Amino acid sequence: NKVTLQTSSGNQIVLENLDDKLIEIDDEILIKKESKKIVFDQKKGIKKLSYNTLTVPYGKRFDVELSDGSIVYLNSGSSLKFPVQFINGMERKVYLDGEAFFNISENNKDIFKVVSNDAITEVYGTQFNVKSYKEDSFSEIILVDGSLGVKGLSDNQEIVSLKPGFRANVNQSNEKIEIFKVNTKIYTSWIDGRVIFRDENIDSMILKLERLYNVIITNDNKKLSDNFFNATIVVEEESIDEVMGYLKEVYNIKYQKFNNKIVIK
């Protein structure tokens, strides 16, 4: 359950074990570790793409600054495969499993693409959130600022444009895209350590709590499936015990806890 970086040569680095400093990895590539973030500098003369994979387990968060200056904030239970160095004149492409917020540096020549489990998001310079876990039935793309296009993975899919303040849902089974107007803060507040639930069903809330706190939650009370929940959690300040205590007090949810397993009665 550690944050790891798998380098292009296959070496695995446990980032949490390292002090904040400059680190040399494959082919004399230097990265800088800054608390819960790593920074890749642009190295000129690179002509061949090679990829690293940053993996963040449940209960953790980590950020990476890519070689073009774009910053990616990775949420719990997520992984990002990205080029060690982007190459001028080539599209900038990364691969996401999980959830991440992207702050993309502007580049009018080299398009930036995020390939997730069932969608491709194309941008030049913008701020947006992508949530695409394998176990989810659809991917969510939320645009905060700028403009972007979304399409399914199939070659014959047309790109759907998204405006700021809107969310695109891409169905994993048929790649159908639906657009909704949303309050983007609800979907991006996790970057600042807050998770906002608004009219959330029990199954969705359980999934998010499992990822945030690295616990296993079983719901034996099927009547709760008809209810919707509201809460705001400050993850680093509130334990899972405090969160469950709140749900018990406000929504009369009864539960038992055994180590990292919670059973809702």
Residue spans for each PLM region:
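A residue-level detector for the "anchor" residue at the start of short, highly conserved motifs
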Residues: 1-265
